[in-house]
Swiss-Prot record:
Record-linked CDD domains: SHMT (cd00378)
Signal peptide: none
Gene: glyA1
Sorted UniProt keywords: Amino-acid biosynthesis, Cytoplasm, One-carbon metabolism, Pyridoxal phosphate, Transferase
InterPro entries for this protein: PyrdxlP-dep_Trfase, PyrdxlP-dep_Trfase_major, PyrdxlP-dep_Trfase_small, Ser_HO-MeTrfase, Ser_HO-MeTrfase-like, Ser_HO-MeTrfase_PLP_BS, SHMT-like_dom
Cofactors demanded by this protein: pyridoxal 5'-phosphate
Protein name listed in UniProt: Serine hydroxymethyltransferase 1
Modified residues (N6-(pyridoxal phosphate)lysine): K240
Organism of derivation: Rhodopseudomonas palustris (strain ATCC BAA-98 / CGA009)
Keyword set includes Protease: no
Subunit structure of this chain's protein: Homodimer.
Similarity section: Belongs to the SHMT family.
Top enzyme class: transferase
């Protein structure tokens, strides 16, 4: 007969720390925390969430299945997850001035897929910004579902100033007669004319959708025009400049469309929603409703302009000449550099960014002629204009050094910059 204590396994299961249960994963998390603490994060789609968001996302709500919507679930025991989801919905509506909100999309891709499922049939024509001009994979890239199942027609930017030509968009819409027109992207540094887009959509009988995943935080903070009054549907991720957990959000002012989007998410695309993530979304929306979030977003834009001007003054070309939001694209061709080589050198120097294609880029997507830089994450940790000017000079120092090297590396300069980056980040600690 066994003499083992039958309670020992459950006791360990509910009490063992991550370090005790899985030291390998614990070590990886420690390493990632160290990286975030000691590197300047300039990836435009990344941010640093609050401890409260982390706590909500790591809560016991991860245990709960809740297929359906608040008050109409397929499972019992949903009274507390209903509270969380209703708070997330109400806060999202208040934050963006929308009549309806679906907080269940697990990702940005799934929120956009839900709009397509609700509004289009396979083979239907839609318009979006070309990925090469700053659009997004889910707006009709050939490798994406949106490009495989539907018929994308892409508008682009002018060669002379790399900005969207609205007259050209109108002409293309008249020719293509799309059922849906999308504004928004992943690497467009300028403002969008939502009013004109809606007029164009109305002129051809199309729905107008805005994917504001990148600039939603700026909209919430009042430093970027809101698409919600103009669009039939607005989608956004809840991370990036909104500074929440990774996930998606669908907004509309049209009740009939809201029902379509709800059905498209569940049961159309997803089953049980991630209630721990929805709880964290609610926390992030509450944070974004506070006055200090307006200050934060104002700083994000000011810091982006400071970084852009510093790089321009150091002799670097910027796509479209600058930025109106939180991101910028550096055209590396005048320096004789490639995006992939430049990204690696900056990472070695403690500055995290990503290679990025530029409009009419002659290089392949995994090489590129550009870098994308963004200010949300470093602004969250407290960087201001002076710090971003310093970062701009450090970037220029590294890139100028590797431009003079034969192998895309400048070890002495990279090491020197990395030390100065550590001194800078030590002044702005995170998660103490």
């Amino acid at each position: 007969m066994s003499t083992a204590n039958p309670a020992s396994a459950p006791d360990s299961f509910f009490s063992a720390s991550l370090e005790q249960a899985d030291p390998e994963i614990a070590a990886a998390i420690r390493g990632e925390l160290g990286r975030q603490r000691h590197e300047v994060e300039l990836i435009a789609s990344e941010n640093i969430v609050s401890r409260a968001v982390l706590e909500a996302q790591g809560s016991v709500m991860t245990n709960k299945y809740a297929e359906g919507y608040p008050g109409n679930r397929y499972y019992g025991g949903c009274e507390f997850v209903d509270v969380a989801e209703n708070l997330a919905i109400d806060r999202a509506k208040k934050l963006f001035g929308a009549n309806f909100a679906n907080v269940q999309p697990n990702s940005g891709s799934q929120m956009n897929q839900a709009v397509f499922l609700a509004l289009l049939q396979p083979g239907d024509t839609f318009m979006g910004l070309d990925l090469a001009a700053g659009g997004h994979l889910t707006h009709g890239a050939p490798v994406n579902m949106s490009g495989k199942w539907f018929k994308p027609v892409h508008y682009t930017v002018r060669r002379e100033d790399q900005m969207i030509d609205m007259d050209a968009v109108a002409k293309l819409a008249e020719e293509a007669k799309p059922k849906l027109i999308i504004a928004g992207g992943s690497a467009y540094p300028r403002a969008w004319d939502f009013k004109r887009f809606r007029e164009i959509a109305d002129s051809v009988g199309a729905y107008f959708m805005v994917d504001m995943a990148h600039f939603a935080g700026l909209v919430a903070g009042g430093v970027h025009a809101s698409p919600v009054p103009h669009a039939h549907v607005t989608t956004t991720t809840t991370h990036k400049s909104l500074r929440g957990p990774r996930g998606g959000l669908i907004l509309t002012n049209d009740e009939a469309l809201a029902k379509k989007f709800n059905s498209a998410i569940f049961p159309g695309l997803q089953g049980g929603p991630l209630m721990h993530v929805i709880a964290a979304k609610a926390v992030a929306f509450k944070e974004a409703l506070q006055p200090d979030f307006k200050v934060y977003t104002k700083n994000v834009v000011e810091n982006a302009k400071a970084l852009a001007e510093t790089l321009r003054s150091a002799g670097f070309d910027l796509v479209s000449g600058g930025t109106d939001n939180h991101l910028m694209l550096v055209d590396l061709r005048p320096k004789g550099l490639k995006g992939n080589v430049s990204e690696k050198a900056l990472v070695r120097a403690g500055i995290t960014c990503n290679k990025n294609g530029i409009p009419f880029d002659p290089e392949k997507p995994f090489v590129t002629s550009g870098l994308r830089l963004g200010t949300p994450a470093a602004t969250t940790r407290g960087f201001g204009v002076a710090e971003f000017q310093q970062v701009g000079h450090l970037i220029a120092e590294v890139l100028n050094a590797i431009a003079q090297s034969s192998d895309g590396a400048a070890p002495l300069v990279e090491a020197s910059v990395k030390q100065r980056v550590k001194e800078l980040t030590d002044r702005f600690p995170i998660y103490q």
